[in-house]
Swiss-Prot record:
Protein name: Heat-inducible transcription repressor HrcA
Keyword terms: Repressor, Stress response, Transcription, Transcription regulation
Organism per entry: Fusobacterium nucleatum subsp. nucleatum (strain ATCC 25586 / DSM 15643 / BCRC 10681 / CIP 101130 / JCM 8532 / KCTC 2640 / LMG 13131 / VPI 4355)
GN (gene name): hrcA
NCBIfam families noted in UniProt: hrcA (TIGR00331)
Biological role: Negative regulator of class I heat shock genes (grpE-dnaK-dnaJ and groELS operons). Prevents heat-shock induction of these operons.
Alphabetical list of InterPro entries matching this protein: GAF-like_dom_sf, HrcA, HrcA_C, WH-like_DNA-bd_sf, WH_DNA-bd_sf, WHTH_transcript_rep_HrcA_IDD
Family of this protein: Belongs to the HrcA family.
């Protein structure tokens, strides 16, 4: 069940007064990083309620699970449930400045003809704009997007496959041979392979099968680097306030490339099932089901290229500037989609 559905289903009865107080508590915690009491709520947020009334409202919010006391203060901070309600119902996305718009445009105003370059730029840009870890993920490869394959003869026992996708992604794979092969045999093999691709008889996930099923020489197919790439920029920024053990766990998780890909693919599938029309999504670490990421949040947008979907976004501490971050990602996402659409049109003109 998504966070949106879960929250809305559990607290349909929250009053406007409770919303007002909850919004102030979460905003204060995100901004200051500290608990807040009834007097501060009245002074800082101009809430026209008595301190006694606010204390009663806070007690009700605590009973409902939206806020909690800390061990060191009588003030309150939001729980994960409070965060989720704030993000889905109360948060107003901040508009980005004209200077930020111009800075983003300057990054994307140069002609780019490969998705990989767009994603590299985007990962770096998002990390600079937000000071969080910028993330950009290619779409999961499907079985209908191979344009052609080139085989490069390295030596008698090694051939490199260069796989060109319809969206201009270029992948490489090393093919290890059981016994010697000549350049002429490699040329013959690439002709056979591309003929099958043109006839839709073989796709990206079948290339290994093509080699291993033939009476040929191939006995090993490297797959250390899966065909879906992702780019993470400024990962240390999200680890500043964590202890050494937690930092080690997070770094080890991000080093497991398969786990990372599965996480992002899961998010894409989840949004597809929800049929979400939101441009920017937020998921808290506890919703990811990954222990190493429980104290973090992921703010992201999904882009589309040729019917396949990928992700751009940032990962940072749970106490992050959501309003500003969501505004930035929303604008960057629009720029990325415009650039991809332009790239696709140029490609179609050449067909």
């Amino acid at each position: 069940m998504s966070a949106n559905k879960k929250v809305r289903g559990e607290i349909m009865g929250i009053s406007e007064r409770e919303k007002l107080v909850l919004n102030a508590i979460v905003d204060y915690y995100l901004t200051v990083g500290d608990t807040i009491g009834s007097r501060t709520l009245v002074k800082k947020y101009g809430i026209e309620l008595s301190s006694a009334t606010i204390r009663n409202v806070m007690a009700d919010l605590e009973d409902m699970g939206f806020i909690e006391k800390t061990h060191t203060s009588s003030g309150r901070i939001p729980t994960d449930m409070g965060y989720k309600y704030y993000l889905t119902e109360l948060l107003k996305v901040e508009k980005i400045t004209q200077e930020e718009i111009e800075n983003i445009s300057n990054v994307y105003n140069r002609r780019v003809d490969e998705l990989e370059n767009i994603l590299k730029k985007t990962s770096t840009l998002l990390s600079k704009l937000t000071n969080y870890a910028g993330i950009a993920v290619e779409p999961k490869p499907d079985n209908k997007k191979v344009s052609r394959v080139e085989l490069v003869y390295i030596d008698e026992y090694l051939v490199m496959a260069i796989i060109v996708m319809d969206d201009r992604r270029v992948k490489t794979k090393n093919i290890h041979l059981a016994y010697p092969i000549s350049k002429e045999e490699v040329e013959k093999k690439v002709d056979e392979l591309n003929a099958k691709i043109r006839n839709n008889e073989i796709a990206i996930n079948d290339i290994e099968k093509f080699f291993t099923e033939s009476t040929d020489i191939v006995y090993e197919y490297d797959d250390e680097d899966e065909l879906s790439k992702y780019f993470i920029n400024n990962l240390p920024s999200m680890l500043k306030n964590e202890n050494i053990a937690e930092v080690t766990d997070v770094i080890e998780f991000f080093n497991e490339r398969k786990d990372i890909r599965e996480l992002f693919e899961k998010l894409i599938e989840q949004k597809a099932q929800e049929n979400s029309k939101s441009n920017v999504n937020v998921i808290l670490g506890d919703e990811l089901g990954i222990k190493e990421l429980e104290d973090f949040s992921f703010v992201y947008s999904i882009y589309d290229i040729g019917g396949a979907q990928g992700i751009i976004g940032v990962m940072g501490p749970k106490r992050m500037a959501y309003s500003k971050t969501m505004g930035l990602i929303n604008h960057v996402s629009r720029e990325v989609n415009k650039l991809i659409n332009s790239m696709e049109k140029d490609k179609n003109k050449k067909v």
